Each structure stands twice: as C-alpha cells, then as structure tokens.
C-alpha cells in the first residue's frame, strides 16, 4: 500500500498520505497452483447413507418442485460423476497436477482434490421409488442446464427453456414425465448459487471437452459457458483477429496503438507460466474451479481492450460488437482515435475476390484488383492522395504525420457508417457508438476540411 509523506508549509505539519485499495488484485491460475500444489479443491458434506440410488430420488423431487436442499442435489451430481468413466489414451496433466496416466480410467472427479465429510441429515422422499440409471442423463441434463439458464438474458430465457426441453425430450422416461422444465428452470437459482455447483459443472464440462465422444456429451449444452468464463478479455483479442482477418493473435495486437492498452496486453500476455494455449488445461475453468477470484484475462480486468475491440467491430458492422455490453473504459479519446484508424485501414477488406482461375490470367486478375483498391481508397479519401500503408506502423505514421487530423471526408464516412448501425439495445457498445463516437474524437484531433 502506497504511503507518502507530505509537509504543509504554513503550519509546518507533516502527514502521511495513504492510498486505500478499492479494487482487489487479479489472481493468476499459475499462482494458485504454485501456492497450493494440488488439484482444485472440492469440499463436500454428503448426506447420511448417501448412494446414487437415494440421491436420484432427491434430484427427481427437486426437479418436480419439492423443497429439497440443493446440497442433496449436489450429492446426486457427485455420485453420478463416479459413473462417467473413460480410459486415457495419453497422459493428462495440467499445471503440474497429474490427472491420469495413459491407460488409467478417469472420471470428472479425477480433476479434483476431494475432501469429504458426513452430513448427519437424511432426506426422506415424499414419494419413495426405485429409479434406474436410465433417468440419469435426463435428470443431470436438466440440473446442469440451470446454470446456462440463469446466465442467459431474461428476454432469451423462455427460448432457452424450450430448447432444453427439445434436446432432452428423447431421454425422458415414465419416471420423469411429470417434470416441467420451464417451471424448474425458473426456480433453479438456489441450486446454481450453491458454492459447489460450479465446481461440479466445471469438472463435467472439462471431462467432456477432453472426451467429446463420451455418451454423456449432450450434457455440455448446459455447461459449455463455464469454459473460458473469466477469459472474455482473451476472447475479445481473438475476436479482433477474426474481424480484421489476421492470421495470428500477434498480428491483431499490433493494431493496438493507445497507451492505455499496454498494461492490459502485458497483464494477459506477460505471464508465460499460465497454460493459455495448452489443450485440456484447468486454465479455461479458473473461475468455475475457484482458482481465481478475479481473472487477469476477463473483459472487466481489461476494459480498454474490450472497448476498442467492439468499437472497431461496431464500425465494421459486426452484430456481436454492436450488442456487446459497454463497460468501464480507459482513456476513451485515445481508444476512439485508435478505433477510427483501424476502421479506415480495414473497411475495404470485405474478403470477396476472385480466388480461382486459369494460370494464364492470374496476373491480370491481381492487377485489376489492385486498381480497384486504389480507386476505392482514392474515393474514400475525398480526392486526397490515397492512403496506402501496408502495415500498422505505416497507418499510424500516416496519421502522426497529419498530427492526427481527420479530413472532413473521413468524418463524414464515419458518420455514415454510424448512422447505418441498426436499432441498438441500451447499455451496448452499439448504442455508445451512435451517441458518442464522433463527439469523443478529442479536441486535439481537429477535423481538417477539404
């Protein structure tokens, strides 16, 4: 914590300036594994005499609307995970933790360091019955889908519930026919809020991602949102690569000019010990497994990058960017200018071109394409000499040489594109672009009339 001594000249009083920490620091997965030297922790207190058979009944009655403690439903998912087995064809390790060796039989529970205690409470079913394993995929599927339902925008929840019912309908049995999925999903928040639910769901999703052909693969419909939870900043960068049509992530990062972006790029990229690009790693599940309380890789921890990426995407007409949530940003004037430069550099890259032809005419086709691009850039420049840099450095240098002054033609082009953005939702990047983009070109970046 920063502590600086200052001196008041008139009263000759010395005092200490202390800076409170209003935000918690980010937590890297690698740090957690280094400090704990174990798999993600899972502490469970199972009900007395718990078995898969008894827990099934509790889960069924929970789904039917009975007042069943969510912890008993977690017991069922835990017992069910023991039946999800697969033999490893290669060693499976992550962050130094051995999940299994080649030839071992593993389950989702193999991903966890499990600490079990006994719950003295018993569950007395309202309607005792014997259920077989044929109901499991239907029961577990509904329970896991409650996670995605509760993370879905409320306007989309009804449609999601209908989709869940359609996907799971083939697995319904006589015992499950009285379950009303829409009613259960509406009342499922108590289960999703249980501290062990995300851990169990993450273990199932990571297991099924490793074994996509497993018989329970359809369960991922409800859990896939847990993969890369807390990685939305990385997802933003990857999306920038896509919309700019770059071959690699580094090629996209080269277009980040604003100074406020530097610390965020470092935050996500400088720790080489995290398994960002390792297959079947714990990394994408850092939030679900509780190995990071504040991810360094989220959009919330990298607001300037999130804002820039979706400003660019909105200008280039991406519905995903237009509908992205507008979050707290950094130095907005710098980000707006950065977005404008990237837009002008890429607006003609629509991707449509002649890709096949006879060998003898290919040079002629390339010459025609170059001439067309030249005409388009000249027209876009409002009659000024066409800007034809070939890389990020060249484009930035072009605007540096102009003292970052945009021509009236360029501002008109921006206005035309912005006005063409369709109806937008409140709180989105698209709304912000329509209302504020032009006015946030900083005063130092004067418009030069042609």
Curated annotation (Swiss-Prot):
InterPro entries: Rhabdo_ncapsid (IPR000448), Rhabdovirus_ncapsid_C (IPR023331), Rhabdovirus_ncapsid_N (IPR023330), Rhabdovirus_nucleoprotein-like (IPR035961). SUPFAM superfamilies: Rhabdovirus nucleoprotein-like. Its main location: virion. GO terms for molecular function: RNA binding. The keyword RNA-binding applies. It comes from the Viruses. It is found in: Virion; Host cytoplasm. One of its GO terms (cellular component) is helical viral capsid. Keywords: Capsid protein, Helical capsid protein, Host cytoplasm, Ribonucleoprotein, RNA-binding, Viral nucleoprotein, Viral RNA replication, Virion. Homomultimerizes to form the nucleocapsid. Binds to viral genomic RNA. N in nucleocapsid binds the P protein and thereby positions the polymerase on the template. Interaction of N(0) with the P protein prevents the uncontrolled aggregation of N(0). Encapsidates the genome, protecting it from nucleases. The encapsidated genomic RNA is termed the NC and serves as template for transcription and replication. Nucleocapsid assembly is concomitant with replication, therefore viral replication depends on the intracellular concentration of free N, termed N(0). All replicative products are resistant to nucleases. This is Nucleoprotein. It comes from Drosophila melanogaster sigma virus (isolate Drosophila/USA/AP30/2005). The lineage of its organism: Viruses, Riboviria, Orthornavirae, Negarnaviricota, Haploviricotina. The gene is N.
């Amino acid at each position: 914590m920063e502590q600086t001594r200052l001196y008041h000249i008139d009263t000759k009083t010395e005092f200490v300036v202390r800076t409170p920490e209003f935000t918690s620091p980010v937590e890297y997965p690698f740090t957690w594994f280094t400090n704990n030297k174990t798999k993600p922790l899972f502490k469970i207190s199972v009900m007395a005499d718990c078995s898969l058979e008894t827990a099934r009944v509790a889960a069924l009655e929970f789904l039917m609307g009975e007042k069943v403690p969510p912890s008993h439903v977690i017991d069922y998912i835990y017992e069910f995970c023991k039946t999800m087995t697969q033999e490893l064809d290669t060693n499976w390790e992550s962050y130094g933790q051995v999940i299994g060796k080649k030839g071992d039989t593993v389950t989702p529970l193999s991903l966890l360091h499990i600490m079990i205690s006994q719950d003295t409470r018993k569950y007395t079913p309202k309607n005792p019955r014997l259920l077989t394993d044929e109901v499991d995929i239907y029961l577990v599927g509904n329970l896991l889908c409650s996670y995605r339902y509760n993370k879905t925008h409320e306007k989309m929840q009804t449609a999601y519930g209908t989709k869940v019912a359609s996907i799971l309908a083939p697995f319904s049995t006589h015992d499950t026919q009285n379950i009303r999925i829409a009613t259960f999903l509406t009342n499922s928040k108590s289960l999703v809020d249980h501290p062990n639910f995300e851990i169990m769901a993450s273990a199932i999703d990571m297991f099924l991602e490793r074994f996509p052909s497993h018989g329970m693969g359809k369960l991922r419909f409800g859990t896939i949102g847990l993969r890369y939870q807390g990685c939305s900043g990385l997802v933003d960068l990857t999306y920038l690569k896509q919309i700019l049509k770059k071959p690699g992530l580094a090629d996209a990062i080269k277009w980040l000019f604003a100074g406020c972006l530097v610390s965020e790029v470092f935050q996500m990229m400088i720790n080489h010990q995290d398994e960002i690009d390792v297959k079947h790693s714990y990394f994408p599940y850092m939030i679900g497994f509780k190995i990071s309380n504040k991810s360094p890789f989220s959009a919330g921890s990298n607001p300037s990058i999130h804002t820039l990426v979706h400003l660019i995407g909105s200008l280039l007409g991406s519905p995903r960017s237009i509908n992205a949530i507008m979050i707290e940003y950094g130095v907005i004037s710098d980000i707006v200018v950065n977005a404008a430069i990237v837009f002008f550099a890429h607006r003609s890259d629509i991707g449509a071109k002649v890709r096949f032809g006879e060998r003898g005419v290919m040079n002629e086709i390339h010459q025609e394409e170059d001439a067309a691009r030249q005409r388009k850039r000249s027209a876009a420049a409002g009659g000024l000499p066409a800007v034809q840099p070939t890389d990020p450095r060249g484009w930035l240098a072009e605007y540096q040489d102009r003292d970052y002054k945009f021509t009236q033609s360029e501002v008109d082009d921006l206005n035309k594109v912005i006005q063409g953005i369709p109806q937008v939702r409140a709180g989105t990047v698209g709304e912000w672009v329509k209302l504020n983009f032009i006015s946030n070109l900083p005063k130092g970046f004067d418009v030069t009339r042609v």
